[in-house]
Amino acid sequence: MLLVGGMLAGCKGSFIDEEIKIVRQGEGVMRLWTVEQPREEAFLRQKARPLKATDGMSETYQLLKKRMLATVTDTANPGVGIAAPQVGVSCRLIAVQRFDKEGEPFEFYLNPKIVRYSEEKVCGPEGCLSIPDVVDSVWRAREIVISYKEDPWVESRTEVSATGIHKSIKVKQNFSSKKETIRGFTAVIFQHEIDHLDGILFTDRVKDKK
């Protein structure tokens, strides 16, 4: 969305070979898939697959997050949110700028879904990195409740005991579900990005309004 105004090495997860190739083509900004190309628009309109715990522990996933962040914060074409399908990877992963938090950080969400919409709506201008040069007004819920999966990771560290014996300890975060209530403009960003995961573009919402 545009603003208008320590790992398990070698773990592949469920990423297909073409996605791995796209992710590993570099380390910086990724090429955005847009509606200007029929094949890419068809891809953007597909429903993305959920991520598994093994995906979150893969090198491909970590590099994808790094490159998605570089893409959405690119000064040549900055945004306030991005979804994995926009860079050619059909999985349920988004990054959202949290304007409701101190420092307005970008945060990633695995398998996000909206479990409740407020009845109160707001209408505001939206743009999209995948739909160049188009801005229009869209109605969105003012408040939403989202659920998502925690980012899984495995970290190995070595500790020395009192007897001088070195031992390796693995620390693993659970792939558990979390819920959060989001309000205001940040809620709008979440709705826009989660739409991408379901093959819905903001211009479809404009048509709904009309």
Question: Which ranges hold each PLM region?
Answer:
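Sec-dependent bacterial lipoprotein signal peptides
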Residues: 1-9
